[in-house]
């Protein structure tokens, strides 16, 4: 079942996020990671917020352990994310 993931990174910046994306070998508006179905990020008053849809929670958690955590630490994110999961009833993609 698809899962929605909301990650709030308090104190992180979009510049740090861009560095993480580079370390992952991803490019803006390019293809995402295997198992990831949709991804976007925005600046908040206190950091950044990432919103994703993944094939499953297990696929996301492996990706988070293998890439998000290590790369976020490497570029200096000051805090681990506050993460919320949501079961996805439906999603639509561009036509």
Regions found by a protein language model. Give the residues of each.
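Mid-chain, well-packed structural core segment of small domains
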Residues: 71-72
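Short S/T/G/P-rich N-terminal loop/turn motif that feeds into the first structured element of a domain
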Residues: 1-67, 76-95
């Amino acid at each position: 079942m698809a899962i929605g993931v909301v990650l709030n990174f308090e104190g992180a910046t979009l510049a740090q996020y861009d560095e993480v994306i580079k370390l992952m070998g991803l490019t803006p508006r390019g293809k995402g990671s295997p198992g990831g179905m949709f991804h976007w990020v925005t600046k908040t008053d206190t950091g950044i917020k990432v919103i994703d849809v993944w094939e499953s929670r297990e696929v996301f958690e492996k990706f988070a352990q293998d890439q998000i955590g290590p790369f976020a630490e490497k570029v200096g994110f000051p805090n681990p994310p506050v993460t919320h999961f949501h079961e996805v009833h439906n999603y639509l993609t561009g036509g």
